[in-house]
């Protein structure tokens, strides 16, 4: 499991610019089910919530992969934390994803990413109050020696949204 954060530096009381998303890479020899989608060995899927898309407000799969594939500089100040998951942790992530198909100012991408990450990881992160990508990025960067700057974002599958997942027409 990877937790990605990106933000634009601003001198404002609350910086809401940026995005937070997760990724799961299948490092096994068999297909894995993540959020109801089957991913093949050696491939990855990204997950995040979005409220600024006319097709759906809530859970999205692979839109971040799509964005970075077609616009490599789409996300600035990108950082990530990474955790190797066992079967029980993957089940906990899937349970969290089943409840995550929503978006609001308080249940935004930062709140979503932190909630799922904190479900399975002992290194807890804090998205702030209100939850923002910049606050979560600062929390990630406080995990000294554990975060990576400018990590690669995998692109293996088409874009889906919702739970259960539906193929996106906008990103087809």
Residue ranges and their predicted role:
Residues 1-77, 103:
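Glycine-rich catalytic cores of cysteine/serine-nucleophile enzymes that process amide/ester linkages
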Residues 9, 55, 64, 82, ...:
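Glutamate identity and glutamate-enriched acidic tracts
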Residues 53, 83-87, 130-134:
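Low-complexity, intrinsically disordered regions enriched in charged/polar residues
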Residues 72-92:
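A structural motif
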Residues 91-172:
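Activation targets extended, charge/polar-rich intrinsically disordered C-terminal tails
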